[in-house]
From Swiss-Prot:
Belongs to the CIA30 family. GO terms for biological process: mitochondrial electron transport, NADH to ubiquinone; mitochondrial respiratory chain complex I assembly; response to heat; response to hyperoxia; response to hypoxia; response to starvation. Signal peptide: none annotated. One of its GO terms (molecular function) is unfolded protein binding. This is Complex I intermediate-associated protein 30, mitochondrial. It comes from Drosophila melanogaster. It comes from the Eukaryota.
Length: 296
């Protein structure tokens, strides 16, 4: 009897531990993200509560303007009903006031990984000029293997009172831009940051080939040509870009195969277009993969 009681006590001690291991939902302990910057923490000091209150009161006037504009648009209720072929709706225009405040410039040097430099300013022609130097020399810390990049990206689209939202481009199937480059290839980035942590770094890419020289070029790229990547790696499981969940737009340039040196990309505008003759939904054929191999 005493031995049975001792076994029962041992079993009772183990039950709480067993109960803690029971989950009602699937748990992924292998891949997860601690934060949206994936380890690239901001170097700015954490503001005090007093400073946060002062900043909030300072921004209140601007937020009220955004809120009034939202209410006005809601009452007007005047959406675009007819998307005419050949007509470009400009989304990012560098002739607009305070346009540079809506973009963020980053390089490998910002994270202590390289020596590249970049800036975004208005050119003599009144367009946005993304230029600088890309350098593939990296810090000799035994961790960083490749570097030499520069990016520009729009700030997160939002509503009033710091509410995050997304662009809705579902009615369009073409990305149109007027650019003037230096002969380099640039990467077009469409960020579709998801709700779950594994989707925070989802970006759709396509390559922009520039001719160089003094002449402008009109690039017209179907959205069906964009491919999915995460943290710089092209994903095995691909799919059409969710055009109702675009959070950022940007360009990247890299120094590879001895292409260190200056770069320059002049951007007049970036717009959207509906082409009824383009019926393709996704350009890349997928193959059937076994279960438990790729994101299944």
């Amino acid at each position: 009897m005493n031995s049975l009681l001792r076994q029962g006590l041992r079993l009772g001690c183990c039950l709480p531990a067993v109960q803690q291991q029971i989950h009602t939902t699937a748990v992924h302990r292998t891949f997860w993200e601690r934060e949206k910057k994936s380890g690239y923490k901001t170097k700015l000091p954490e503001p005090s509560k007093k400073q946060m209150i002062m900043d909030g009161l300072r921004d209140l006037k601007e937020e009220m303007k955004l809120w009034r504009q939202e209410v006005k648009e809601q009452f007007e209720s005047d959406p675009i009903l007819v998307f005419r072929p050949g007509e470009t709706d400009v989304v990012f225009d560098f002739k607009a006031p305070d346009v540079l405040d809506k973009w963020t410039v980053t390089t490998d040097a910002d994270h202590g990984e390289g020596k590249s430099t970049a800036t975004l300013e208005l050119s003599a022609a009144g367009a946005g000029l993304f230029h600088g130097q890309v350098n593939s020399d990296h810090t000799k810390d035994g961790i960083i293997k490749r570097t030499g990049y520069a990016n520009i990206r729009t700030k997160r689209v939002r509503k009033s009172f710091k509410r995050e939202t997304t662009y809705d481009w579902t009615q369009y199937n073409m990305l149109v831009m007027k650019v003037r480059g230096d002969g380099r290839s640039y990467l077009i980035n469409l960020h579709t940051e998801g709700y779950f942590d594994l989707m925070w770094n989802d970006i759709y890419h396509y390559v922009l080939y520039t001719r160089g020289g003094p002449h402008w070029q009109i690039a017209k790229i179907p959205f069906s040509k964009f491919f999915l990547s995460s943290k710089g790696r092209v994903q095995d499981r691909q799919g059409a870009i969710p055009l109702n969940r675009v959070t950022h737009f940007g360009f990247s340039v890299a120094a590879k195969k001895g292409m260190d040196g200056p770069f320059g990309l002049e951007i007049d505008y970036v717009g959207l277009e509906y082409d009824p003759s383009h019926r393709e939904e996704f350009a890349y054929e997928m193959y059937q993969t076994p279960k438990y191999i790729v994101a299944t």
